């Protein structure tokens, strides 16, 4: 009898242990968060006076992790799981929760464009971009290149903190088209005396979070840049990105952005972001015969065209190479803006844009060509 009682007690104890173990596993499973993703959390304008600490608390209380709070955009970059996203969308202080999308460089493969946009006519008059600051918001610039004069910069890529290293080559190529030096070697840029600033927002694979791009644009605003070149883009819109682009333009900066390399798709626009925003100058690509490049994105948002096929420019390591893309067309426009500002330093960014667009050479249907090919000689009159 005693043996039977002992066996029953042992069985009960084992049952209790297994029950507690499985109960604990269930609690752990239930408490495990879903896959976290990167988001941008925007706060309502009525909450603009809310302290940074309070904004951080709003996100943290929902289980989110704040990565960065912006200076000119009433928003923060954060890592959130699905539950936190749902709860933040219900919070009365939150205006929006949007995915922190990834933008990619617009370059396809592996120049003449300087003459095609008539930049030498201004060079011969002594206007070469002096005293104009151009922010190249891209993958960094190889500052050791003998054909480039990089005056400063910053990196917003967490894993690649040196803005003067360019693992993708993209930013260095873009920089050369804007301002390769007039020094008898290599190539000549549109605006060879302009001051280049390397604002790194794309990593060595040519990709970058929208939040990195926002940080880069904020840096350009804070450091009083005159021109911003963005040879990058993504397919998704962003309230935060639009806000900071608009802020840059309202601060007096000329903003040129690549339209994209998505070609045309019937009557649908294929222009990417941020070029799609009205405040930017959206740039498409043509070849040396002024024919639209087959890869050049089309849409009603397209503003102007510039050379973007077989563009020879600087590459890391003191070398040179030819690339194709609206990424290569855009720096022709940024360089042209710098040339105009060197001749007319009191002109506003709106005046520069208007002159570039109103004097462009008509090439065809605006859906595919915008206002046409820029003519910086005419624009600077």
Swiss-Prot record:
<feature type="propeptide">
    <location>
        <begin position="30"/>
        <end position="106"/>
    </location>
</feature>
<keyword id="KW-0720">Serine protease</keyword>
<feature type="active site" description="Charge relay system">
    <location>
        <position position="170"/>
    </location>
</feature>
<dbReference type="InterPro" id="IPR037045">
    <property type="entry name" value="S8pro/Inhibitor_I9_sf"/>
</dbReference>
<dbReference type="GO" id="GO:0005576">
    <property type="term" value="C:extracellular region"/>
</dbReference>
<feature type="binding site">
    <location>
        <position position="187"/>
    </location>
    <ligand>
        <name>Ca(2+) 1</name>
    </ligand>
</feature>
<feature type="active site" description="Charge relay system">
    <location>
        <position position="327"/>
    </location>
</feature>
<keyword id="KW-0106">Calcium</keyword>
<dbReference type="GO" id="GO:0004252">
    <property type="term" value="F:serine-type endopeptidase activity"/>
</dbReference>
<dbReference type="InterPro" id="IPR022398">
    <property type="entry name" value="Peptidase_S8_His-AS"/>
</dbReference>
<feature type="binding site">
    <location>
        <position position="275"/>
    </location>
    <ligand>
        <name>Ca(2+) 2</name>
    </ligand>
</feature>
<dbReference type="GO" id="GO:0006508">
    <property type="term" value="P:proteolysis"/>
</dbReference>
<dbReference type="InterPro" id="IPR010259">
    <property type="entry name" value="S8pro/Inhibitor_I9"/>
</dbReference>
<dbReference type="Pfam" id="PF05922">
    <property type="entry name" value="Inhibitor_I9"/>
</dbReference>
<keyword id="KW-0645">Protease</keyword>
<comment type="function">
    <text>Subtilisin is an extracellular alkaline serine protease, it catalyzes the hydrolysis of proteins and peptide amides.</text>
</comment>
<keyword id="KW-0964">Secreted</keyword>
<feature type="active site" description="Charge relay system">
    <location>
        <position position="138"/>
    </location>
</feature>
<keyword id="KW-0732">Signal</keyword>
<feature type="binding site">
    <location>
        <position position="147"/>
    </location>
    <ligand>
        <name>Ca(2+) 1</name>
    </ligand>
</feature>
<dbReference type="GO" id="GO:0046872">
    <property type="term" value="F:metal ion binding"/>
</dbReference>
<protein>
    <recommendedName>
        <fullName>Subtilisin J</fullName>
        <ecNumber>3.4.21.62</ecNumber>
    </recommendedName>
</protein>
<dbReference type="InterPro" id="IPR034202">
    <property type="entry name" value="Subtilisin_Carlsberg-like"/>
</dbReference>
<dbReference type="Pfam" id="PF00082">
    <property type="entry name" value="Peptidase_S8"/>
</dbReference>
<feature type="binding site">
    <location>
        <position position="280"/>
    </location>
    <ligand>
        <name>Ca(2+) 2</name>
    </ligand>
</feature>
<feature type="signal peptide">
    <location>
        <begin position="1"/>
        <end position="29"/>
    </location>
</feature>
<keyword id="KW-0479">Metal-binding</keyword>
<keyword id="KW-0865">Zymogen</keyword>
<dbReference type="GO" id="GO:0030435">
    <property type="term" value="P:sporulation resulting in formation of a cellular spore"/>
</dbReference>
<keyword id="KW-0378">Hydrolase</keyword>
<feature type="binding site">
    <location>
        <position position="181"/>
    </location>
    <ligand>
        <name>Ca(2+) 1</name>
    </ligand>
</feature>
<dbReference type="InterPro" id="IPR050131">
    <property type="entry name" value="Peptidase_S8_subtilisin-like"/>
</dbReference>
<dbReference type="InterPro" id="IPR023827">
    <property type="entry name" value="Peptidase_S8_Asp-AS"/>
</dbReference>
<feature type="binding site">
    <location>
        <position position="277"/>
    </location>
    <ligand>
        <name>Ca(2+) 2</name>
    </ligand>
</feature>
<feature type="binding site">
    <location>
        <position position="108"/>
    </location>
    <ligand>
        <name>Ca(2+) 1</name>
    </ligand>
</feature>
<dbReference type="InterPro" id="IPR000209">
    <property type="entry name" value="Peptidase_S8/S53_dom"/>
</dbReference>
<feature type="binding site">
    <location>
        <position position="185"/>
    </location>
    <ligand>
        <name>Ca(2+) 1</name>
    </ligand>
</feature>
<feature type="domain" description="Inhibitor I9">
    <location>
        <begin position="38"/>
        <end position="103"/>
    </location>
</feature>
<keyword id="KW-0749">Sporulation</keyword>
<comment type="similarity">
    <text>Belongs to the peptidase S8 family.</text>
</comment>
<feature type="domain" description="Peptidase S8">
    <location>
        <begin position="111"/>
        <end position="380"/>
    </location>
</feature>
<dbReference type="InterPro" id="IPR023828">
    <property type="entry name" value="Peptidase_S8_Ser-AS"/>
</dbReference>
